[in-house]
Swiss-Prot record:
One of its GO terms (molecular function) is pyridoxine 5'-phosphate synthase activity. The active site is at H43 (proton acceptor), E73 (proton acceptor), H197 (proton donor). This is Pyridoxine 5'-phosphate synthase. GO terms for cellular component: cytosol. 1-deoxy-D-xylulose 5-phosphate binds at D9, H10, R45, H50, T103. Pathway: Cofactor biosynthesis; pyridoxine 5'-phosphate biosynthesis; pyridoxine 5'-phosphate from D-erythrose 4-phosphate: step 5/5. It comes from Caulobacter sp. (strain K31).
Amino acid sequence: MLRLGVNIDHVATIRNARGSSYPEPVRAAELALAAGADGITAHLREDRRHISDADIALLTDLCLKRGKPLNFEMAVTDEMVGIALQARPHAACLVPERREEVTTEGGLDVVKGFDKIAAATARLRTAGARVSLFIEADPAQIQASADAGAQVVELHTGAYCDAAREGHADRAAAILERLKTGAELAASLGLEVHAGHGIDYATVKPIAAIPQIAELNIGHFLIGEAIFVGLPQAMQRMRVLMDAARLEVAA
């Protein structure tokens, strides 16, 4: 079954907007797991704009108690590798990070940063973390990810979702085809394939229909929708669409 990882970063965004102690990301994570999330994703950014070090400690403890994986998103820096080695999350997803960006704007350039990424990957794997690289569906990046020692690639779906939402059908179709080809290549290299960024109800099914994808990581949309309908209900509808896409492919 296609897995759903729930990113709870933007619960922390709401909390930090008032400099308060609530809403608590760990409470959102607990609700998500109770509602059937297959794992929790959290991004500890260098500027700590949403998730904090304390959140990571609480989320690590929660996921261990619930027997579910924590996917720790992190920049490729010595500081973040050190934090990950101490927290020992189930998975570490290396992502690009620029302080001036509002959200992650694209995939990690594994080709350009190969030596640094390979070294971080080796350190994390030695500590028992399952290492994922967040990349574009580009053949060179996928091959470099395998060469760097990653076990997983997470394909960046943001460009597809933006094109589809904006009504650029031809562009969306071309990007979707690249995602399909990239997923096939990654799987052929022995990499587990995940996907994420920008996914909502309108865009999830074409992505979920790609058979090589094992997991979708969705956050901003689910947290936004939860304001209106509640997190379990938002997740349930997403899960229905994901499962329907897989059933349609099987049929």
